[in-house]
């Protein structure tokens, strides 16, 4: 699974729009795409009306395996919520969040199911 991260500290620069367009493009080319909404504002999740209690926060804390929401056959999303804002505090003294995320995706089996992961 190839991972593409779209990030910027400034809000309103098009991160969500870029992720949506890129994901749709890859899915239209028969690629299996997993979108990860890691933003506590959950704009990506709201755009697709994808709210779940088994979300990205649950993946980070290891409480439950997240349940990806199917947008289409080739496009799925793991949603976010306000609790996601506390992840950095929970990971103090551990490895960086991106390393934790990578390890969780591998151990949950997601890397074998998708061609691309867009964060």
Predicted regions and their residues:
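P-loop NTP-binding core
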Residues: 1-119
């Amino acid at each position: 699974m190839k991972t593409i991260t779209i990030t910027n500290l400034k809000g309103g620069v098009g991160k969500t729009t870029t992720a949506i367009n890129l994901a749709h493009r890859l899915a239209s080319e028969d690629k299996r795409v997993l979108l990860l909404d890691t933003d506590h504002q959950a704009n990506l999740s709201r755009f697709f009306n994808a709210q779940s209690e088994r979300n990205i926060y649950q993946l980070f804390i290891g409480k439950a395996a997240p349940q990806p929401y199917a947008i289409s056959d080739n496009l799925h999303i793991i949603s976010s919520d306000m609790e996601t804002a506390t992840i950095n505090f929970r990971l103090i003294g551990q490895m960086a969040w991106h390393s934790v995320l990578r390890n969780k995706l591998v151990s949950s089996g997601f890397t074998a199911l998708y061609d691309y992961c867009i964060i």
